[in-house]
Amino acid sequence: MKKKFGLVTSVVLALSVIVTACGGGGATGDAGGASGDKAKKIALIMRQNVGTFSAQYINGVKTEVEKNGGQLTVFNADTDLSKMASNLDAAVNQHFDGILIDHGTAEALQQGTQKAVDKKIPVVLFDTDIKIPGVPVVEQDDNKLAELSLEQLAAENNGKGNIVKIWVAGFAPMEKRQVTYDAFLKKYPDIKEIAAFGSATNNTALDTQTQMEAILKKYPNKGDITAVWAAWDEFAKGATRAIQQAGRTEIKVYAIDLSDEDLQLIQEANSPWAATAAVDPSNIGRIHAQTVFQKIKGEQVPDNVKLNPVLVKQSDLPKDKKVTMGDLSEYVNEWGK
């Protein structure tokens, strides 16, 4: 069950906020505090803004910033770590009151993060491998995410079969998920990896679909591939569409992460997407922003805020209506708790 978090105690009435993620510079949403206090400027430094998971995460950040009467600026690096480092430097030099970092790396951002700390700017990380005293990390339990999805794969396929892994290196959560995957293969010697690929691009789902189509042509017979394990929902979307178009829906997809778009795909007739392990991305965004406001107020914040995932199975969902993230808790008991 996911850890419950209290709301930030100081709630300020806010004006409407519009936040648009953009490349290069930042897009700003204003929410002036009704109390007359100067609105706190918050920078969200993103490695990439791809798919509906990212959109719902940003919306969660925006909601919390709006509630606290702040101004949010989103900097999107379009997967370019050097650009991400430049965006962080810009946020520090522009004297933002708080900085949120999403999926950065120590190699690219350690120096910039330390610069922010030296200037007394609160920084809160999400799924980023930087370790600096006083800089908290909000993270999903990536090992548990991988374990839940992989164990479901094993359970539904009697602990055996040929699988395709879709994964990419260079992201802190991916590296943790890989550790669990390696242990999984040792635990289930009758499950064999026959192919592995994956890359994070500006069109990840479409690029994955193209690559998965090639894999299906290489293994054309029913039974050649038992399942696909996708370490990110953008990978799962591409794999699912390729499998559907090829008419190979005997191949099941097990994945990590969830969004409204993913739910629609899971609920399609004869969808191969069988299960996914996830944390609500809107909740991640809210907690990420909530934590930086706690830091701004001088409140005590733990070094690590870990969010526990939930397994969502296709079989949990009704056949006669389309479920959204907003009403998923009606069908998956632990969702949103």
Regions found by a protein language model. Name each.
Residues F5-A14:
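Sec-dependent N-terminal signal peptides
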Residues A14-S16, N59:
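Hydrophobic alpha-helical membrane context
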Residues K2-K4, C22-K337:
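A residue-level marker of the well-folded mature domains of exported/periplasmic proteins
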